[in-house]
Amino acid sequence: MGAQFSKTAAKGEATAERPGEAAVASSPSKANGQENGHVKVNGDASPAAAEPGAKEELQANGSAPAADKEEPASGSAATPAAAEKDEAAAATEPGAGAADKEAAEAEPAEPSSPAAEAEGASASSTSSPKAEDGAAPSPSSETPKKKKKRFSFKKSFKLSGFSFKKSKKESGEGAEAEGATAEGAKDEAAAAAGGEGAAAPGEQAGGAGAEGAAGGEPREAEAAEPEQPEQPEQPAAEEPQAEEQSEAAGEKAEEPAPGATAGDASSAAGPEQEAPAATDEAAASAAPAASPEPQPECSPEAPPAPTAE
């Protein structure tokens, strides 16, 4: 029992000599497995760290014990010791110290904020012309883009319009050309019909001789006459030479052509002697196409047709 008391007494002396260590030993930091010496190195934020003894022992530079020795010597030395104690408290409480540091940094930042604002304003004022210069070309760069888009759109629209107009012009020209060809064909058909009409009185004048030479009936010749203008009108619309295609027989296609031209010339000049020959040839060519009966009669008409020319 005496040994135990001695141990407890020794412990009490130790606690009296080093209350900070006893407080640290009784601190719940041991639950983490940290010893007293480790607390100095790690600087663990324990509730005992707030005590002045712990603060003094936690100093690693040894300024705290020196301050304790020099307390009766001078009060001025206590001020740096207090400052160091404050630093030790900040070190022991890293979270609070960080918050204090942030607050301290924020405090000088606040007075410097007007200066920063002034500097920012001056920088903005100095950079404002540059920014304005940079902003000035930016709208100019945007406007040409818009102009380019507009011009491109207008160009495309104009091109489409021109192409559409060109197509209209081309279609109009094609229609005019077709109309001109149709008018020319109509004129040729009218001229051919006029020549045949002019040749009709010639046929009436010399119809007896022509019918006697052909040996055909007058009714067949009269029926062939209305068929003649129909045949030349159709080929006239297709080709300029309507009279050459009006004849059904391919062998006699070349022979009546000069006769037809002679008939046109006779209608223009006025001689009635050549007109009966051309009309006889046309009637002879149209007769076989109109009815199959006069086909054998066409054979004797073939030799006198060139002789009449």
From Swiss-Prot:
GO molecular function: actin filament binding; calmodulin binding; identical protein binding; protein kinase C binding
Induction or repression: By lipopolysaccharides (LPS).
Biased composition (Basic residues): 145-157
Keyword Oxidoreductase applies: no
Region (Disordered): 1-309
Entry coiled-coil feature ranges: none
Record-listed Phosphothreonine modification sites: T15, T79, T143
Compositionally biased region (Gly residues): 204-215
Keywords: Acetylation, Actin-binding, Calmodulin-binding, Cell membrane, Cytoplasm, Cytoskeleton, Lipoprotein, Membrane, Myristate, Phosphoprotein
Modified residues (Phosphoserine): 26-27, 29, 46, 63, 74, 113, 122, 128, 138, 140-141, 152, 156, 160, 163, 171, 246, 291
Subcellular location field: Cell membrane; Cytoplasm, Cytoskeleton; Cytoplasm
Domain of life: Eukaryota
InterPro entries: MARCKS
Feature: compositional bias, Pro residues: 291-309
Disulfide bridge partners, by residue number: none
Subunit organization: Interacts with CDC42. Interacts with GTP-bound form of RAB10. Interacts with calmodulin/CALM1.
Family according to the record: Belongs to the MARCKS family.
Function recorded in the entry: Membrane-associated protein that plays a role in the structural modulation of the actin cytoskeleton, chemotaxis, motility, cell adhesion, phagocytosis, and exocytosis through lipid sequestering and/or protein docking to membranes. Thus, exerts an influence on a plethora of physiological processes, such as embryonic development, tissue regeneration, neuronal plasticity, and inflammation. Sequesters phosphatidylinositol 4,5-bisphosphate (PIP2) at lipid rafts in the plasma membrane of quiescent cells, an action reversed by protein kinase C, ultimately inhibiting exocytosis.
Protein name in UniProt: Myristoylated alanine-rich C-kinase substrate
Organism encoding this protein: Mus musculus
Organism ancestry: Eukaryota, Metazoa, Chordata, Craniata, Vertebrata
